[in-house]
UniProtKB/Swiss-Prot annotation:
Biological processes per GO annotation: translation
Coiled coil: none
Single GO molecular function: RNA binding
Ribosomal protein recorded as keyword: yes
Keyword terms of this UniProt record: Ribonucleoprotein, Ribosomal protein
Alphabetized SUPFAM superfamilies for the sequence: Ribosomal protein S5 domain 2-like
Domain of life, per lineage: Bacteria
Gene3D superfamilies in alphabetical order: 3.30.230.10
Name of the protein in question: Small ribosomal subunit protein uS9
Keyword Glycoprotein (UniProt): no
Family: Belongs to the universal ribosomal protein uS9 family.
Pfam families according to UniProt: Ribosomal_S9
Length: 129
């Protein structure tokens, strides 16, 4: 079957490659059902959000290959990739996805640990004497 839209989504260190095809609403992540891959309801809602925002939850089958990061980051990357693929498939989806903030890459990353400190911001305990 022909791919209608292909999109790449990113969140933190997770990267998701997404293909959408005409179908009946099946979402597959790394060859597993989305419900089996993401354990929490919040992660499932996040992944399906672009489909609900464009009222396409029963119109397309979504195939996602995601790697890197943790499950929350991967869920965000999937949502970003699905949103981009939906725009490629049908440009009329762009307005509703942009309004929901689903096409914007979340640029927040983990701040690096600095030398001479315990963490990114936390310092070692200070002793006056």
């Amino acid at each position: 079957m022909k791919n209608l839209g292909i999109g790449t989504g990113r969140r933190k260190t997770a990267v998701a490659r997404v293909c959408i095809r005409m179908g009946n609403g099946n979402v597959t992540v790394n060859r597993r059902d989305v419900g089996a891959y993401f354990p929490t309801a919040e992660q499932l809602r996040r992944v399906r959000e672009p489909l609900f925002a464009t009222a396409n939850e029963r119109r397309y089958d979504v195939i996602v290959n995601v790697y890197g990061g943790g499950l929350d980051g991967q869920a965000g990357a999937c949502a970003h990739g699905i949103a981009r693929a939906l725009v490629r498939a049908d440009a009329s989806n762009q307005a509703s996805l942009r309004a929901g903030g689903l096409l914007t890459r979340d640029s927040r990353m983990v701040e690096r640990k600095k030398y001479g400190q315990r963490g990114a911001r936390r310092r070692f305990q200070f002793s006056k004497r």
